[in-house]
Regions:
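Short aromatic/hydrophobic "clamp" motif used to bind/position activated sugar donors
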Residues: 102
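Acidic donor-binding loop at a coil-to-helix junction in glycosyltransferase catalytic cores
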Residues: 180, 204-218
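Glycine-rich, basic loop-to-helix element that forms the pyrophosphate-binding segment
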Residues: 81-97
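Short, flexible, basic/aromatic active-site loop/helix in glycosyltransferases
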Residues: 152-177
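A conserved acidic beta->alpha catalytic loop
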Residues: 38, 55-64, 109
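Conserved donor NDP-sugar-binding/catalytic core segment of glycosyltransferases
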Residues: 114-151
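Short, well-formed alpha-helical segments that are part of the catalytic scaffolds
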Residues: 28-41
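Catalytic core of nucleotide-sugar-dependent glycosyltransferases
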Residues: 224-228, 234-237, 248-286, 300-304, ...
Length: 363
């Protein structure tokens, strides 16, 4: 597509920035405006940062909102690419960015005033390749009582993957890479490129089976290199949770189903790497011997706390939705050669080379 810098681009960056802030968005102009408003209040010189709004095909007022803020920041760029998937915005902005440190945030988070300064502090040690900060949920309405079943506690602090909450206390500390999430995903640009970029992340509902392990996949690759992940409490963001996300079990259903898709995605990539001579059908047979039906039916239960007492409705969701997602992904992997190619891409940096499946091109 016009204007895309390829992974091997020789284009000289006009200016090396300290920090590139990348916001992936689609049809959430009001939420986006709140996020950029918060960025405008950061305690940092705007000459040190650049902001990218990566629009994944919005039909609302997102372009107008972006243009308004482009007049405020000296280094601001709006990227429009309607091809489906969060991966598009992530990687388009990655190759147009000039920051030594990259901050990928969602359009429903609002960085706190000292966030940018603390982001840069997080990478003072060369041993740190990836980082995050506190993620503070802000509910539009009081959440239902059953949500407490999905808030977990460990020796680091409290967290909830479903609700995007992370509170590991007031001290800077090393953490497992699995706790660096896309709502507040901080990484060295060099490390991101060496890791091969993101795996597929969020997808529209009708293409949900094309999702992958996204941000978490990058973290695990980074960890394999020996680099460490850091939690900096000052690199905090507020995470807006609207009432429609918390008033029913629909979000839980979508999330657990997605966990099933991701479980299959990760499994098939691992099996293909370990068994490079096997065909797609053979890999499916191998998958059936690798993961048990009990493991499949328990997909998502690792995100419940030990005292969980689920309602019958939620218990049914946890018993069925993860396995449904897993089976659907396996079905597509078995019958669709182009889908297999998508899942087994070495990396997704070259978007034009990766986006060949007809379903991903039917915009």
């Amino acid at each position: 597509m016009s204007g895309v810098r390829s992974p091997n681009s020789s284009m000289v960056n006009p200016k090396v920035m300290d920090l590139s802030i990348i916001i992936s968005t689609r049809n959430r102009a009001q939420s986006l405006a709140k996020a950029i408003d918060a960025i405008a209040k950061l305690n940092i010189s705007f000459d040190q940062i650049e902001i990218f709004v990566a629009d994944n095909g919005s039909s609302d007022s997102t372009p107008i909102v972006s243009q308004m803020y482009a007049n405020i920041f000296p280094h601001f760029k709006y990227i429009f690419d309607p091809r489906p998937g969060q991966l598009i915005g992530w990687h388009r902005a990655l190759f147009e960015s000039n920051g030594e440190i990259l901050a990928f945030i969602d359009d429903d988070v609002r960085p706190t005033p000292d966030w940018a300064k603390c982001v840069l502090e997080s990478f003072e040690s060369p041993e740190i390749g990836i980082a995050t900060g506190q993620i503070i949920p802000e509910f539009e309405e009081r959440p239902p009582s059953w949500q407490k079943d999905m808030v977990l506690e460990n020796n680091l602090g409290i967290w909830s993957a479903l609700w995007g909450m992370l509170d590991f206390g007031t001290k800077i500390k090393e953490i497992p890479v699995d706790f660096v999430w896309g709502s507040n995903f901080l990484i060295r640009r060099k490390v991101m490129l060496e890791a091969g970029g993101f795996h597929p992340g969020g997808m529209p509902k009708e293409l949900f089976h094309f999702t992958g392990d996204g941000d978490v996949g990058v973290g695990r690759i980074v960890a394999e290199t020996g680099l460490k992940a850091l939690y900096h409490p000052g690199a905090a963001v507020a995470h807006d949770l609207p009432a429609n996300r918390n008033s029913s079990a629909n979000e839980v259903k979508r999330w657990i189903f997605g966990e099933g898709l991701v479980t299959s995605y990760v499994l098939m990539r691992r099996l293909a790497t370990a068994n490079s001579t096997l065909t797609g059908t053979n890999l499916i047979d191998l998958a059936e011997d690798t993961i048990s039906s009990t493991e499949i039916s328990n997909i998502g239960r690792g995100y419940l706390n030990a005292e969980s007492k689920l309602s019958d409705e939620l218990d049914l969701l946890f018993r069925t939705c993860g396995s449904e997602g897993f089976r659907l992904h396996q079905k597509y992997f078995k019958k669709d050669a182009l889908f297999r190619d998508w899942v087994l891409q070495p990396n997704y940096l070259d978007l034009d080379a990766c986006y060949t499946h007809p379903d991903l091109l039917a915009i």
